[in-house]
Amino acid sequence: MKEAKRKKLEEKGWKVGTVAEFLDLTPEETTLIEIKLALSRHLKERRQKSMTQTVLAEKLHSSQPRIAKAENGDASVSIELLIRAMLATGATPQEIGEVIAQVG
């Protein structure tokens, strides 16, 4: 948010902060969320290049709606499923590590 806009809101009595502050997240929780979102974005990019959500779901013995949730960063999706899905699209452990390393 631009500083001028922040000041105007604060002058009108609004409290301005980050999502992490609002949700009272620890730095570790914030980083974990950022990692999951990065994995979700990269999963969607990789999957769109090579297969449908249905095909990926079949490879993982999962469902298409679950893959959609994984690609959209749904909080109910585990990091394990995200990593398994990335591997099923052909990602290497090194590529997955690079995605995680870019967070922060």
Model-derived regions, located:
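DNA major-groove recognition helix of helix-turn-helix/homeodomain DNA-binding modules
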Residues: 78-96
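Helix-turn-helix/winged-helix DNA-binding modules
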Residues: 48, 59, 74-77, 88
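Short alpha-helical DNA-recognition segment
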Residues: 49-69
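Alpha-helical DNA-recognition elements
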Residues: 69, 73, 84
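Alpha-helix N-cap/N′ positions at the starts of helices
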Residues: 38-39, 62
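Residue-level detection of the helix-turn-helix DNA-binding "recognition helix"
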Residues: 61, 72-73, 101
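N-terminal flexible/basic segments that precede or flank functional cores
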Residues: 1-38, 98-104
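Short basic helix-loop element that most often maps to the first helix and adjoining turn
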Residues: 12, 39-55, 84
